[in-house]
């Protein structure tokens, strides 16, 4: 936490950060807990404005675990992005135009993914990689899933400005 704080303070006095909030509003443990803890901790730092981007409102009980603060806001897709397919597209690509409109300077993909094209958008990006079990033990997964996860992982590595690895 101190390292992240130091990096942000060096960059400038005020910064707008976008966080991938899908797991924050949908997962009670694991990735969701990680995201809620990070969002709450970052919200306590002066000079940060946080925008939590989620494809929908998810579960009230999880969303309510995120502190209500002046510098923390949830953002959801609108219009054509309301269908399941639309939400998936928004999260993987359409979110970029919304972040540009919102003035996001840094986006953190909390669950190992970044929107396609974020590098070209001018928005700096950080991604947290939690595990690569699908690569180490592909026998635990359907072969199609391994291919999808591998493609997404490699794409994310190409897009990311910084990578946080929190497991072996």
Question: Where does each model-flagged region fall?
Answer:
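Carbohydrate transferase catalytic cores enriched for Leloir-type hexosyltransferases
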Residues: 1-168
């Amino acid at each position: 936490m101190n390292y992240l704080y130091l990096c942000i303070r060096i960059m400038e006095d005020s910064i707008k950060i976008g966080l991938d909030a899908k797991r924050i509003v949908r997962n009670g443990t694991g990735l969701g807990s990680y995201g809620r803890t990070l969002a709450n901790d970052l919200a306590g730092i002066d000079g940060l404005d946080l925008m939590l981007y989620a494809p929908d409102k998810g579960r009230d009980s999880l969303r309510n675990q995120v502190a209500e603060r002046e510098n923390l806001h949830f953002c959801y897709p609108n219009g054509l992005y309301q269908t399941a397919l639309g939400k998936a597209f928004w999260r993987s690509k359409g979110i970029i135009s919304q972040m540009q409109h919102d003035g996001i300077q840094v986006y953190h993909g909390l669950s190992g993914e970044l929107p396609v094209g974020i590098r070209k958008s001018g928005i700096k990006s950080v991604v947290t990689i939690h595990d690569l079990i699908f690569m180490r033990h592909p026998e635990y997964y359907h072969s199609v899933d391994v291919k999808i996860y591998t493609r997404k992982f490699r794409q994310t590595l190409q897009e990311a400005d910084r990578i946080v690895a929190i497991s072996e």
